[in-house]
Amino acid sequence: EILDIFKITPKYDLDIMIERQTLEHVTSSILMKLSDILAKEQPDMILVHGDTNTCLSASLAAFYKKIPIGHVEAGLRTDDIYSPYPEEFVRRTVDSISSLYFCPTINNADNLIKENISKDGIYITGNTVIDTLQTTVKKDYTFKEPLLNRIDYNNKRIIPITAHRRENIGVNLENICNAIKTLASKYPDAHFIYTVHPNPAVKNTANRILEGIDNVSLLPPLIFTDLHNLIARAYFVMTDSGGLQEEAPSLGVPVLVLRRETERPEAVQAGTVKLTGVEYKNIVRDGRMLFDNKSVYDKMSNAVNPYGDGKASRRIVDAIKEYFKNL
């Protein structure tokens, strides 16, 4: 779907997705298939993005063939290798073998310098997701998810929710869902839209606690454009996701982060994001604060977005040109 938005036709499809596969299986499948492709194509550089298993596997495949790596969204850190898991390990590993580092913020660049990475390869670009929002968010937008077209956005306070991280499955997710249930009861004028990950451990908990509540909708994961346009119409967002901590503030929407730490402290420092955590009482407290305290809400929604001006992609292209020009 993202490829369609930007009219990109991939030359290769690794076709590795199967249900219930382990991290080890995903990593090895990508590594083996991509290794063959790199041997055939012999690229001058590969670009990897973020902190997924695909990012890790592609970086390893390139490193084994001594192909330079450019890491988009480099330098994010929580300082706890198991939180988020396995993303923190992925980005530390990828940054240890990259040649170019495209950092969303100054803080990310500083993290790399502290790890003795040369300044020569570090570029502060902003985040590419801000570039994307300029294409995906539209004033007159028809959602692909039918339910989203039936919502009264003018008279309802819309609260999109994502909560699916591995480290939150279990008691933490139950706390999150019970807090949503409490807030939904206290604020009948709000509509809580939880996009539920298909992982049975997530789906079963969400259904057990939240199914049947009038102002809570449980939806499958949304396509990219639906999610962005829903956020643009939201009152605030509740999430344990990384990307939404950047996307929502860019649209003037406050965020409650349902995690104990974040690799994106810039938004917390700027005041657009609050690190709420995973305790029931804290989630309810911070939710009520945004519903009831207009001055706090206005301060969060009007804070300056720290993640760039929508020109990150151009800066990345220019940095790559400079790299090869100086070889």
Q: Where are the predicted features?
A:
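Nucleotide-activated sugar donor-binding and catalytic core shared by glycosyltransferases
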Residues: 1-194, 199-327
